[in-house]
Amino acid sequence: MRESWGASLKTICLIGGKLQGFEAAYLSKKAGMKVLVIDKNPQALIRNYADEFQCFNITEEPEKLVAISKNVDAILPVNENLECIEFLNSIKEKFSCPVLFDFEAYRISRDKRKSKEYFASIGTPTPQDKPSEPPYFVKPPCESSSVGARIIHDRKELKELEPGMLIEEYVEGEVVSLEVIGDGNNFAVVKETLVHIDDTYDCHMVTPLPLDPSFRELSYSLAANLPLKGIMDVEAISGPLGLKVIEIDARFPSQTPTAVYYSSGINLIELLFRAFNGGIEEIKTLPEDRYCIYEHLMLAENGVLIPVGEQVLSMGNDYGNYYEEPGIEIFLCKGENPVFTLVFWGRDREEAEARKNKGLSILKSRFGAAA
């Protein structure tokens, strides 16, 4: 493995062609990079959005990936396949470019029980485990999926849970998110966002939030105590009793990075590369004259646009550009029902909302859609 990686990121190789991959590819393109996507699925969701798509299983043909590493500036895993992640960790020393990933942090964050132990070890406030009285909040023990997450109001229902499900107190409040990128010594806490969730606890919209010193301090502590060399997403509930961290995910997120980009001007792909090439600086101030609305809407059979989350989006078969003008970008995910990802930005919320209205009118004129 080379000791010096060079100063610029011109070509990035993404391992994974689903929603995480789309987010990373989008921001890479915004930074002027060429995007190569590798996925073992020939019908990978973003195969046509990438500049180049190669279909093969890296665990079966590692020599291909080693050869590719000589012609790209970085490799970024954008999937949650544990076999794939562990395999990349085992062969990363053979690559001629860095892997922009903290494997040890991912091991902790992927396992929600290990995460809770980590939170307790550094005094991070978090929902109580196995409370004596309902309501309870139950969620899967691994990965970042919201599948199976729900509120239980009757103790009897606990007996019907799938084995291994985590049981926590239900905490009222809004779901908030913060990305942190570290180089192992310095940790850049980026931009707070509000995660709008549906009845299945899946995110259908992201909007920016004002600076929150306590959330930034918590997120910094979580990154510094690992210590993080890579990217990590911190999610918390912000309620009447303050912040309670519900999970960390040490992998490149989907949805929030685009909202962060347009509301702060910070490209998380560029910042992540700097963590492996020369180091990063902590972020002290952010611009206040930016706002962004990021959301997913499905065109139902009755012509109505319905908010949906990533669970629906992930069932699509092709994802790419649909419409663009200053302050408006619309992406189309083809499938049983078309799902649009709409991104609107401006100097403030009012300008972003005006552009949202224009974007919705575009869909209405083309599809007869009603929001």
Curated annotation (Swiss-Prot):
Top-level taxon of the source organism: Archaea
Binding site for L-lysine: 19-20, 80, 254, 310
UniProt xrefs under Pfam families: ATP-grasp_3 (PF02655), PylC-like_N (PF21360)
E.C. code: 6.3.2.59
GO molecular function term, any single one: ligase activity
Primary role: Is required for the biosynthesis of pyrrolysine. Catalyzes the ATP-dependent ligation between (3R)-3-methyl-D-ornithine and L-lysine, leading to (3R)-3-methyl-D-ornithyl-N6-L-lysine. Is also involved in the synthesis of pyrroline-carboxy-lysine (Pcl), a demethylated form of pyrrolysine that is generated by the pyrrolysine biosynthetic enzymes when the growth media is supplemented with D-ornithine.
Binding residues annotated for ATP, in chain numbering: 18, 39, 57-58, 80-81
Sequence positions that bind ADP: 112, 139, 146, 168-171, 247
Protein name: 3-methyl-D-ornithine--L-lysine ligase
Domain (ATP-grasp) ranges: 93-277
Cofactor(s) demanded: Mg(2+)
CC terms in the record's Gene Ontology section: cytosol
Note on cofactor: Binds 2 magnesium ions per subunit.
Amino-acid positions noted as binding D-ornithine in the UniProt annotation, renumbered to this chain: 177-179, 233, 251-256, 310
UniProt-annotated binding residues for Mg(2+) 2: 247, 249
GO biological process: pyrrolysine biosynthetic process
Pathway info: Amino-acid biosynthesis; L-pyrrolysine biosynthesis
PROSITE patterns: ATP_GRASP (PS50975)
